[in-house]
Every structure is written in C-alpha cells, then in structure tokens.
Amino acid sequence: MDKQIYIIHENDEWIVPLREELKKINAPYKEWHMGRDKIDFSNIPPEGVFYNRMSASSHTRGHRYAPEDTILVLNWLENHNRRIINNSKALKLEISKQKQYQELEKYNIKFPKTFFCKDKNSLLENSNYFDKPFITKHNRGGRGLGIKYFNNKNELNKYVNGDQFEPSIDNTTLLQEYIVSDPQVITRVEFINSKLLYAVQVDATDGFELCPADPCNLEEKFCPANSDGNKFMIIKDYNNNKISKYQSLIKSNGIEIAGIEYIQGKDGQHYTYDINTNTNYNSIAEKKSSLKGMQTIAKFLFDELNQRTTKSNFSFPNLSFPSSVIR
C-alpha cells in the first residue's frame, strides 16, 4: 500500500473541512475513527504521516474512552518510529488542564490562580482562598462545557451539594479565579508546524461555550468588533511578546498544531488558560484573510508525506571504486 496521511479522530463533523482541503490537493488520506475503528497492535503499522486530532471533549459525544484508546495507538506508532503530528505527549496536554498549567508555569507564562480539586470537600476548602468571584472548570473538557461562575463560597456550596453538580469525567475539577477581561474578548493564537499562523479575537460577552468550528457557530451573534455579526475575527498585524514562549512550550511537548487561548485582564496582563491540540477554524472569519487554517494543515501534512515518500524512494547509485581506496 502506498503511503497515506492517517487522521486519528472521533468527530466526523470536525473533519469535514480537512477532508475538503486534502481532496483539493489530491492528498491520499485515511481516517481512523477511535469511536468505531479497531486497530490490531499485533501488526506493523502502515507507513505514512499520522495526524492526531483526539479531543478532550470526546466523552460528550459518546466516546468516553477514545483518548485512552488513542494513547494506545500513539504508543504503538511511536514504538515503530512513525511520523506523528501531535504525539502522545501532546495528547497528555489535551486531556489535562493540570498538565497544561504545569507547562505554562515551567515557561513562566501567566495563568489564573487555580486549585485542582478531587472532591466536593476540596472544592469548598479551596474556595476560602478567593475573596473575589471564581469559576469551576473540568480538568478534562472542551468548548467551555461545565464551567460555572460563583460570587462566593455560599453559592459554590449550593452547587456542589445540589442536583446540578457536574463532576469532571476524570474526577478532577478546577477552582479558578475569574479574570474580568478588558475588552470582553478572548484571543486564540493558532500554530501550525509549531509556527504562528494567526490570532483570532472571540467575542466572549455571551458566556463560556466558545468553539471556532463552523458547526458550533451556526447562529451568528453580534460581535461589536465585527460588523458581519460573526463572533470570530482574525486580528490584523497581530503581535505578542509571548509567542516565542508559546512556541517553546508546544515544541517541547510534541505539539505541532495547536490553538492557545488567553484573555487580557483589567490589569493589562495576559492570562493564558487553555491549550487546544485539537484546533478548529472559523470559515467566516477566514473569508476576510488570506490565511486559511485547514488549507495550511492539509498542505503541511502533504508536504510531510512527500518528504517521507521521497526519502524512501531514494537509493544510492551503483558506484565502483578502485580496490586501493576501499578500507
């Protein structure tokens, strides 16, 4: 079998734009859906380029153990020295905000004050360290699902001891200071091939469930900075002195494609709070820019595949030397 691009994922809807871009450039590809497909680890994996697009929110789509299954696949591929985009180290960050924040701290990147709580008692005890509003957040999650806002410990107590309490799928809940953003936007910085592609501004006035993928953004709402009503807008001439730190962080963790989110507080400082290795792009925002996320990913994957195809097809010419020069 000829070499192909293998896309490892669990959400068909998010793959549609990538399929379209790969077809446009005639790139051979195959999908491994971790909610349906079975992988035989007794076999030697095929040759090619493997792109891991596993999502921390897979459990919300009925694929509870897809990340764990993907880790097994990535371990198998790595054991056979296959080329992987976003390897097993990257997946560990995708499914654990605790791991993300450890890496942010290592690279001296500011993030909100956060406690990682294993049970309800821990949540209530650590809330004593906040004298301002705070939020809860799942350690393994995505799109802001499960995030709740609290003004004080009494409100938290009613929540954790009530019927509406939502434990994280991995049993770890973050208790985090609420940063009042100024302006009311978040910024998502996109990287492909560990290089900056662009930054997108997201209107955050409506809450926490933010997802740049088109299926998540069908109902266009007014964004004060964007006259067409789309909540997502690519920032022209974006500049941020944290870019080099972001790049160092993702490179050291096997991440080549990512979206990193931060907000600016009223104190003027940037607070980074999420690293997404399963990144999506908003086509409406991209219409106003020459930069295209999925198009760039497709080209990157195809270039990587072609490099490996060229290397494997290369052979040294049949050269003969006088016996005197052979040692």
Where are these regions (language model features)?
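Rossmann-like NAD(P)H-binding beta-loop-alpha module
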Residues: 107-133
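Conserved N-proximal alpha/beta basic substrate-recognition cap immediately N-terminal to
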Residues: 10-113
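Protein kinase-like catalytic core scaffold
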Residues: 134, 174, 197-198, 258, ...
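Short glycine-rich anion-binding loops that position phosphate/pyrophosphate groups of nucleotides
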Residues: 55-59, 139-141, 278
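Conserved anion/nucleotide-ligand pocket segment
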Residues: 131-159
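C-terminal active-site "lid" helix and adjoining low-complexity regulatory extension at the edge
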Residues: 237, 251-255, 264-327
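Phosphate-binding site of ATP-dependent enzymes
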Residues: 148-253
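Extreme N-terminal starter segment of soluble prokaryotic enzymes
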Residues: 1-6
